[in-house]
Amino acid sequence: MTDRTAAPSGPHIPVLLKPLLAAVAPVTGRWLDGTFGAGGYTKGLLAAGADQVIGVDRDPLAFEMAQPWAAEYGDRLVLQQGVFSRMDEYAQELDGVVLDLGVSSMQLDLAERGFSFMKEGPLDMRMSQDGPSAADLVAELSEVQLADVLYSFGEERASRRIAKAIVKERAQEPITTTLRLAEIIEGCLPRPKPGQSHPATRSFQALRIAVNGEYEELMGGLLAAERALKPGGLLAVVTFHSVEDRMVKRFFQHRANKTGNANRYAPAMEEQPSQFELVTRKAVGPDKDELAQNPRSRSALLRVGRRTDAAPVEITAKELSMPQLKETR
């Protein structure tokens, strides 16, 4: 059994850190890093001039691994275990919030966390190490429910075929490891051409999102940031796949009154106050230098908004284009 606190292979490189710091410059005051992970963004913000950073993570391992270096920042660094959708309970009047979505490199590199289809490990995928694991979902969901998860959360076109194969295989023997599940999925799909992603990529993404409630957490986090930021405060979000980016894009469009009129024949609606101004008009991706240094950045996109003094308002899952399982629609 691998030591659960062993350091991941290779240094952690925060994605899009340089363009993020450029977009939010000058960095001053108190910031919250809602996805602390290995501390890459937190270190970058502190080095850029933040007076204090509150590092939030649901994974207790993140703080165990930060112990060797966190103390050097003194009271400039505050660590808070929890979910970023509750950030407004941890702090108010923030000057900035950073969210780096999805699984962290630290979690991906530790085989025993069960996030990677490239390494043998228990089929876990829990970021907080609490609640049902991916193995539990694979064992307990019906074929229809599994297909719904794979299609809705992973945009997997072969979701029904894969779900059928999983149900067939689990009847023979429980599916409890990452490589066993990856092998089952590979058997359902054509061999990928050079440059194409691994056949299990979308299915593993879907299960991870379901296990951790990532879309609900993202929606809650965007709303919590709106409540926690002071006027002029900045919200920077880094996403890694199209669904996350679409949700963040829709949030900023909605809050900046940039959604447009869905029906050109309908009477114009009275413009509502804007909760955010767009800092990045379009999503910012990695440049060629970052791609060469960190291949994991290839799908990363950054969006940044600036908080106004307008009162926070609610938003629906539909308005955010948030995928929902059939049973919750």
From Swiss-Prot:
Its EC number is 2.1.1.199. S-adenosyl-L-methionine binds at residues 39-41, 57, 84, 100, 107. It catalyses: cytidine(1402) in 16S rRNA + S-adenosyl-L-methionine = N(4)-methylcytidine(1402) in 16S rRNA + S-adenosyl-L-homocysteine + H(+). SUPFAM superfamilies: Putative methyltransferase TM0872, insert domain, S-adenosyl-L-methionine-dependent methyltransferases. Residues 285-305 are annotated as: Disordered. InterPro entries: RsmH (IPR002903), SAM-dep_MeTrfase_MraW_recog (IPR023397), SAM-dependent_MTases_sf (IPR029063). One of its GO terms (biological process) is rRNA base methylation. GO terms for cellular component: cytoplasm. Keywords: Cytoplasm, Methyltransferase, rRNA processing, S-adenosyl-L-methionine, Transferase. Its main location: cytoplasm. GO terms for molecular function: rRNA (cytosine-N4-)-methyltransferase activity. CDD domains: AdoMet_MTases. It is an enzyme of class 2 (transferase). Pfam families: Methyltransf_5. The keyword S-adenosyl-L-methionine applies. It is found in: Cytoplasm. Specifically methylates the N4 position of cytidine in position 1402 (C1402) of 16S rRNA. Belongs to the methyltransferase superfamily. RsmH family. HAMAP family: 16SrRNA_methyltr_H. PANTHER family: 12S RRNA N4-METHYLCYTIDINE METHYLTRANSFERASE, S-ADENOSYL-METHYLTRANSFERASE MRAW. This is Ribosomal RNA small subunit methyltransferase H. It comes from Ruegeria sp. (strain TM1040). The gene is rsmH.
